A protein has these predicted regions:
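Sec-exported extracytoplasmic/periplasmic mature domains
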Residues: 9-13, 29-34, 63
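...with weaker cross-activation on analogous glycine-rich loops/strands in unrelated enzymes
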Residues: 2, 34-100
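Intrinsically disordered, low-complexity
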Residues: 1-15, 92-105
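Extracytoplasmic/secreted envelope proteins and their assembly/folding machinery
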Residues: 5, 9, 22-26, 52
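Active-site nucleophilic cysteine motif
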Residues: 16-32
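Generic intrinsically disordered, low-complexity segments enriched for polar/acidic and small residues
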Residues: 21, 26, 74, 99-102
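Short N-terminal micro-motifs specific to bacterial/archaeal maturation
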Residues: 15-16, 46
């Protein structure tokens, strides 16, 4: 899973303008030959249980990102769809929603 994390971290700061959160996750996993749905609801429904390790997908209601294993998430967060790294706790606070859990594919 560290290869997935490395691929996600390499995209931090990119102003892609093309990926929402689930599309970003799907793209990163696809770089490693792993198919992931392009919908946060489908990621939650179809993934296996994870534990927040590096490369796991952290899921909120309507949002997903890739865990770094240290309490942070790499994700596409805002209207500009920039790739950024934030603490999972801050994302939960900003969005006023709790983490549903973690998924692996």
């Amino acid at each position: 899973m560290s290869n997935i994390l490395n691929s996600a971290e390499a995209l931090i700061g990119e102003e892609t303008g093309k990926w929402d959160c689930s599309e970003f996750v799907s793209h990163v996993y696809s770089l490693h030959g792993i198919s992931v749905p392009q919908s946060s609801a489908q990621i939650w429904s179809n993934g296996k249980n994870g534990n927040g390790s590096a490369g796991d997908i952290v899921c909120w209601s309507g949002h997903v990102g890739i865990c770094d294993g240290n309490g942070n998430v790499i994700h596409s967060y805002n209207d500009n769809k920039n790739i950024r790294k934030d603490s999972i706790a801050n994302v939960s606070k900003w969005d006023k929603r709790e983490v549903k859990g973690y998924r692996r594919f």
